[in-house]
A protein has these predicted regions:
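Active-site-proximal beta-strand elements of phosphoester/diester hydrolases
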Residues: 1-9, 98-110, 142
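Structured beta-strand-rich core segments of catalytic domains in phosphoester-bond hydrolases
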Residues: 37, 42-109
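Surface polyanion/phosphate-binding segment centered on an Asp-His-Pro turn
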Residues: 232-250
Length: 250
């Protein structure tokens, strides 16, 4: 089973940069995207053989998520059931027979960490939401989580210690997610791998220099460990400031 997640940084722009070619070539069982930056009706994607589910932000041209799946879910829900968190189209949950599949676009803490306090509340509420799901069946959670967990997860850790995405507070919340019983699948397979990133700033020729961050993840419940086959970061796929990430299950 092949699962793919990609922050497309605007699906309408990404479609102009080869999104559909990659989508069809990948032939994933479940393909999810974050930061769609669109409202309902602004784009009609013809994806034969896939069910489509979209969650739009109230604010136009901002945030948003979508899931495309070959198999129809048993149920689909949008958001996490907390109004203050559910205005930005950040979460879609698809229930399948064997697991819940959750895609997330985690709120960024912003320049000057203006939104860090909100981010901390989000992290706790989202983790609680995942653990509640897990009481019923295992969970796969994937998307742009807007944090580089360890120093090996970004090119320049020392100069970014107090920047959004690499603060001690954000990193601690990711640790708490793992401590709550989730596996960072890429690190499960490649615990010491350096120089592999999923996001590069558009500034300073960052991608050409591979001055990146690994902030896109597939995390799974511990009970799914035996089904893990491989985790990949598809660094050669262009079209966004992020690249897709992949999880293969047995």
């Amino acid at each position: 089973m092949k699962l793919i997640s990609w922050n497309v940084n605007g699906i309408r722009a990404c479609v102009q940069k080869g999104f559909l070619d990659f989508f069809h070539e990948a032939d994933a069982d479940i393909f999810c995207i974050q930061e769609t930056k669109m409202q309902e009706g602004q784009l009609n994607l013809e994806l034969e053989g896939y069910y489509q589910y979209w969650n739009y932000a109230v604010k136009k041209g901002y945030s948003g998520t979508a899931v495309f799946t070959k198999k129809e879910p048993l149920s689909v829900s949008y958001g996490i059931g907390i109004e203050e968190h559910d205005q930005e189209g950040r979460v879609i949950t698809c229930e399948f027979e064997e697991f819940y599949f959750v895609t997330v676009y985690t709120p960024i803490s912003q320049n000057g960490l203006a939104r860090l306090d909100y981010r901390m509340k989000w992290e706790d509420d989202f983790r609680t939401y995942l653990k509640k799901l897990e009481e019923t069946k295992p969970v796969i959670v994937t998307g742009d989580m807007n944090v580089a967990h360890k120093e090996i997860d970004l090119k320049n850790p020392k100069t970014n210690r107090k920047n959004a995405g690499f603060t001690d507070e954000e990193r601690q919340k990711f640790t708490e997610l793992l401590d709550a019983g989730f596996i960072d699948t890429f690190r499960y397979f490649y615990p010491e791998q350096t120089g592999i990133y999923s996001w590069w700033s558009y500034r300073f020729s960052a991608r050409a220099k591979n001055a990146g961050w690994r902030i896109d993840y597939f995390c799974v419940s511990e009970s799914l460990k035996d089904r893990l086959d491989d985790a990949k970061i598809l660094t050669d796929i262009m079209g966004s400031d992020h690249c897709p990430v992949e999880l293969d299950l047995k």
